[in-house]
A protein has these predicted regions:
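Terminal or standalone catalytic/regulatory effector modules within metabolic enzymes
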Residues: 372-383
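Metal-associated gating/positioning segment near the N- to mid-region
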Residues: 43-129
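Mid-domain alpha/beta scaffold segments of enzyme catalytic cores
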Residues: 119-165
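Residue-level marker for buried hydrophobic side chains located in beta-strands
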Residues: 3, 51-53, 230, 373
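N-terminal metal-binding scaffold of metallo-dependent hydrolase/deaminase domains
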Residues: 1-49
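Active-site mouth loops of central-metabolism enzymes
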Residues: 79-97, 144-162, 205-207
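Divalent metal-coordination and catalytic microenvironments
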Residues: 7, 23, 28-29, 45, ...
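Histidine/acidic residue-rich metal-binding segments in metalloenzymes
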Residues: 158-182, 186-372
Length: 383
């Protein structure tokens, strides 16, 4: 039981805007009107608000472990968490270990994190690792947009069977919803290709296109009544001029719910690295007129980090652009994974545009319930 007294409370969901009031929490963790026995915290002069939710992060599973193994130099230079009577040991840095992840998130006021990319093949281990992260609540999303079994059903025109495949995978992986990464592009990467636009059949198939996958997978999530809509990492991430692909993707989502992940990486104009520019105004305008679509910003932080994504072809391109270390994983017939360390520099035109795009989206989208603050940890920087 807990009582918090004298704090300035902000709670938008309950329309509390800066009121000084006492809060009473009973033994079940619920608010109650009557004062309770137990611990009292004097929050005079402090702000009391609901815990933050990081809707898109990468904190557990094979990919983040691969990233940790690839960056031993970061372990040597980073903050160490020494074991005490109340705390387990760990390290921070670009990809903090499990215990450190929980402590660092809680220290910033976050109480829920969503591991946004889990292959079914490694879901069991991911849950074991999530159980090791203290304090915060956790959820996961299952990678589906390049799953060969589902794609085969879509190719055959068997929508109901494709829906049942997705339902079984979500049940088997014990996840909160569906993650779609570069739909069709990761499947094409297994053949050395990619899918940077939505209208051409993907490698290995005659009929289905990335647009088909986007439309049908969003519909499947709606038909299954999932609490979170399809969580979409669009095609052509990170490329100059990719705003065209992003807006085309959104047209394929008309009438469906969807969440666009790390939208900063999908909001670029220009036609080359020398002419890359922000196109966030176009994207924000779409969000402002389509309340069925939510997004997280994917803002970047200047400094060293390590990028991890199921978008294998993009990571191979990033490796060629930077000359840094590169790791690539093929997850059987489900998905893929790429790892590349990266440094965001304010003196770099592309990085400066990326930094500005993340802030612009947070400011230009009018409904604050429609946009989430995220760094796509660790891709845009450690949370």
């Amino acid at each position: 039981m807990l009582r918090i007294t004298g704090g300035t409370v902000y709670d938008p969901a309950n329309k509390i805007d800066g009121q000084i009031k006492d809060l009473n929490i009973d033994a079940e963790g619920k608010f109650c009107d009557a004062p309770v026995d137990g611990r009292t915290i004097d929050a005079t002069g402090m702000i009391v608000m609901p815990g933050g939710v990081d809707v898109h992060t990468h904190v557990a599973g094979g990919a983040i472990n691969f990233a940790r193994a690839m960056t031993p130099e970061d372990h040597r230079r980073t903050q160490a968490f020494i074991r005490t009577k109340t705390r387990r040991s760990g390290i921070g840095g670009m990809a903090p270990t499990t215990f450190a992840t929980g402590y660092l998130y809680a220290g910033m006021g976050w109480t829920t994190v969503n591991e946004a990319a889990v292959p079914v093949l490694s879901a069991r281990h991911t849950h074991e690792e999530l159980a090791d992260i203290p304090i915060v609540d956790k959820s996961t999303l299952t990678l589906m947009a390049n799953n060969e079994i589902m794609l085969d059903q879509m190719e055959a025109g068997e929508y109901e069977r494709a829906r049942d495949v997705v339902a079984w995978y979500i049940w088997a992986a014990k996840s909160y919803g569906v993650k779609a990464v570069n739909p069709g592009g990761v499947a094409a990467w297994k053949w050395g290709g990619d899918a940077r636009q939505l209208s051409s059949p993907i490698e290995g198939y005659d009929k289905i296109t990335p647009g088909t996958i986007v439309t049908q997978l969003a519909r499947i999530c709606d038909d299954l009544g999932l609490p979170h809509p399809m969580h979409l990492h669009c095609n052509d991430l990170g490329a100059p001029g990719n705003i065209t692909t992003t807006l085309d993707t959104l047209k394929h989502l008309e009438g469906s719910r969807a969440h666009i992940a790390h939208s900063q990486y999908h909001a670029y104009g220009g036609d080359d690295w020398d002419t890359i520019c922000s196109a966030t105004a176009q994207l924000a305008e779409y969000f402002n007129t389509h309340p069925n679509i939510t997004t997280d910003a994917g803002a970047v932080i200047f400094g060293d980090t390590v990028t991890i994504t199921a978008d294998g072809p993009w990571q191979h391109l990033l490796y060629k652009l930077t000359g840094r270390k590169w790791g690539n994983l093929d997850v059987e017939n489900e998905t893929g994974c790429g790892i590349v360390p990266y440094t965001y520099r304010p003196s770099n035109l592309v990085n400066a545009v990326q930094w500005a795009c993340g802030l612009e989206l947070l400011l230009l989208i009018q409904n604050p319930w429609q946009v989430f603050l995220s760094t796509d940890h660790p891709n845009g920087g450690c949370f």
